[in-house]
Structures are given as structure tokens and as C-alpha cells.
Regions:
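Bacterial signal peptide processing site
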Residues: 17-19
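Sec-dependent signal peptide recognition
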Residues: 2-7
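Tryptophan-paired
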Residues: 59-108, 257-309
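Hydrophilic extracytoplasmic domains
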Residues: 278-371
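Extracellular ectodomain segments of secreted/surface proteins
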Residues: 22-51, 220-245
Length: 371
């Protein structure tokens, strides 16, 4: 259902931040000299997302492709409760042409305005990622060989200030395609006049207030945390800062880690296992929001653990470690205690070591399986 909200009352509402449109694609992925016809097809779902506390809704628009294809991105109100960059509501998963353009108008409820974006997006990069796929630790072929999988969703994230982010999502990996910038628009009165009664009702300022005060859309703890605070427009761009780092694991008494998943603040995630964990190379990544690990002791008893890092604590640790050497390298060292019941974390590199344990939430469990 289209919801335009409050443009009808534009003179009564505060205007949202009006940034100049500037598209900022992620670092270009090497295409190895292969140029595509821009009509490549893959099976995927197109979905939307937003940060929690800043709900949005698509008024109209979607993905466009060079062969005339179109994928509508209207899917109701996006709440972001599942997490930034998470696969949200969208159309069915079907074989479709990979889009080369995004044209959308969306309502930013927290800002009481409408944004529009009409921009080319990185088609070549998406096609190469779709073709390359990735190895998923949960999928095996015969003889223990890991199965290659590919991405199954294109996720569009709408952040305050008109910032738009696009990711490719799969069950085992999510990668950013690019960051783009929308601009504030006013919907023409003649267009509003053609809307039906229910849609006109949705244009009232009272609807904006209802959305922002609905605990199923904006959780009460988020409402309270955001109360009387200005919108941090640059926050989601700050999440994109990348550093060269890798996780390392210390398991007591000849134990070893055999699987890890890294969930970053910029909504990218990846798995480390088998050869990728054995090599464990330094990679430019965003700062991690969560790390999940699996390990076994010398008796082949399996354990699992998750660490959720406090945003302020881990960002401060990275700032300290990379302060003098922004292009340096560091490790996030996870130390598992002797009884396999707790994990501590340290950012180590460039001659510095900073603990990130005061506010980190840790959960550890013992598996019923041995191997």
C-alpha cells in the first residue's frame, strides 16, 4: 500500500536534511576483462530495509533493467527490527534480469519527508558476484567437498538523509554493491488529489505520529534511546570504514577452532572455515558487530560461542589501534578459557593491544555432538 504521508502538509512539517545527490559506489570489483550485455538473468528476490527506529515505506518505484524489465519494491512498512541490511519484505524469488538502475520514491517517517533516487547501479559488479558465488560451510558435495552457492537477494537499505545502500545477500555471505544518494522531493498536489480516500487518510500528519509511536514498528527501547536526540545522519556511512584485520583463536589444551562467522556493522557478513580459515588472511573489512565461533577440545567435544560487541567500545578500540597506522594490520584475538565456558576479545596490532570485554555480550554452549 502506498503511503506518502504528510507531503500534503509540507508547510507544517519540518524539512528533512537535503543533501546533494552524490552516488558513491563501493570500490569497483575487477571484472577480469569480461563485459556483459546487461541482460544477464539470475534467480533472486528484491527486498528493502532500514535502520531500526527510522521506518520507511516505498511510495512507488523499483529496479529497472536494460531489457525493459522492472521489479517493484513496494512491500509495506520497513521497520529494520531484524537488523540493518537484513533481508526484508519483497516480491517472490524468481529468475529476473539483473537491474542496472534504481528509481524509487520513499517516505522517511522519522524525517517527515519523501526522498527520490534515480540512478544507475553497478550492474557489472552484481553479475560477477552472482557468477562467482561463494562457498557455504553448511553445504557439502561428495567426499566433504564444499558446495558453491550464489546470492539469492538484492537488498536495498534506506538510511536517514536519503542515503541508499545496496547489498547482495546469500545464506552464507552478504556483500555491499554500492552507496547512493537520494534527494528530497514534494509530491505534486494534482497527484495527491487522485489518490483514493484511504490513501489520502494516510497523508495526514497524524499517521506519521502513529507510525513513530507504534511499538511494533519502533520498539519502546529504541523510542526511548532516540528521544530528544537529533538523527545521526552520518552514522551509516561511518559503518563502511574498512580496516585490514582478521580474527584469531586461542583454544586451550590442544583444541582448535573450525568455523567462524563475521557479521559487520556495515551489514556485510562472511564465513571462515576449511581453507579460508586455515589461510586466515588479512582482509579489508568493516568493524565486526558480532563474531560466532565453533571449536572442539582435544577429546573432540564441540562448542559454540557468540560475541556481540558494544558499538562504542569496539569503535574506540579500532580507532586507538589504527590511530597512527590507518593502513596497518590487526587481529581480533578471541581467547577461550580452560573450561570452555567463556571467551574474551582483544584488538591487537600496530604495537597496541586493547581489550573489548567490558560491554561485550558473550554466550557459549556445549554441543551434544562429538567428532
Amino acid at each position: 500500500m502506498k503511503r506518502l504521508l504528510f507531503m500534503l502538509l509540507a508547510t507544517q512539517l519540518s524539512s528533512c536534511q537535503n543533501k546533494e545527490a552524490q552516488n558513491q559506489p563501493t570500490e569497483k570489483k575487477q571484472t577480469k576483462g569480461v563485459q556483459t550485455s546487461q541482460t544477464e538473468k539470475f534467480k533472486y528476490q528484491a527486498t528493502g530495509n532500514c535502520p531500526v527506529g527510522y521506518p520507511v515505506e516505498i511510495y512507488r518505484g523499483g529496479f529497472e533493467s536494460s531489457d525493459g524489465g522492472y521489479v517493484d519494491l513496494q512491500a509495506g512498512t520497513h521497520t529494520g527490527i531484524a537488523g540493518w541490511g537484513h533481508v526484508g519484505g519483497g516480491m517472490s524469488t524468481l529468475v529476473k534480469t539483473v537491474p542496472n538502475r534504481l528509481h524509487v520514491q520513499w517516505v522517511a517517517y522519522a524525517e517527515e519527508c519523501v526522498y527520490e533516487i534515480d540512478t544507475e547501479i553497478d550492474y557489472e559488479k552484481m553479475v560477477q558476484y552472482f557468477k562467482e558465488g561463494y562457498q557455504n560451510s553448511g553445504a557439502f558435495l561428495n567426499y566433504g567437498e564444499y558446495k558453491m552457492e550464489t546470492y539469492t537477494a538484492i537488498v536495498v537499505g534506506y538510511a536517514p538523509g536519503g542515503a541508499v545502500f545496496i547489498w547482495l545477500n546469500g545464506s552464507g555471505k552478504q556483500v555491499e554493491i554500492g552507496r547512493y544518494q537520494g534527494k528530497k522531493v514534494i509530491i505534486p498536489q494534482e497527484e495527491i488529489d487522485k489518490l483514493d480516500g484511504f490513501e489520502k487518510l494516510m497523508l495526514q500528519k497524524s499517521e506519521c505520529e502513529r507510525i513513530m509511536n507504534n511499538p511494533k514498528i519502533v520498539p519502546p527501547d529504541v523510542m526511548e534511546a532516540n528521544r530528544d536526540k537529533s538523527i545521526p545522519f552520518d552514522l551509516w556511512d561511518s559503518y563502511r570504514q574498512k580496516y585490514s584485520w582478521r580474527p584469531t583463536f586461542i583454544v586451550q589444551h590442544d583444541g582448535n577452532a573450525f568455523n567462524a562467522r563475521l557479521n559487520m556493522f556495515n551489514a556485510e557478513f562472511e564465513g571462515l572455515f576449511g581453507e579460508s580459515l586455515s589461510k586466515n588472511e588479512f582482509v579489508k573489512r568493516a568493524i565486526p558487530k558480532q563474531i560466532q565461533i565453533s571449536w572442539r577440545d582435544k577429546d573432540l567435544q564441540n562448542y559454540g560461542g557468540s560475541l556481540w560487541f558494544d558499538e562504542n567500545e569496539i569503535f574506540a578500540a579500532f580507532a586507538e589501534v589504527y590511530k597512527d597506522r590507518p593502513e596497518g594490520k590487526a587481529e581480533i584475538e578471541l581467547r577461550i578459557n580452560v573450561t570452555n565456558t567463556f571467551v574474551t576479545a582483544w584488538v591487537i596490532g600496530n604495537g597496541k593491544e586493547v581489550g573489548i570485554n567490558l560491554k561485550t555480550k558473550v554466550e557459549v554452549f556445549k554441543s551434544r555432538l562429538k567428532r
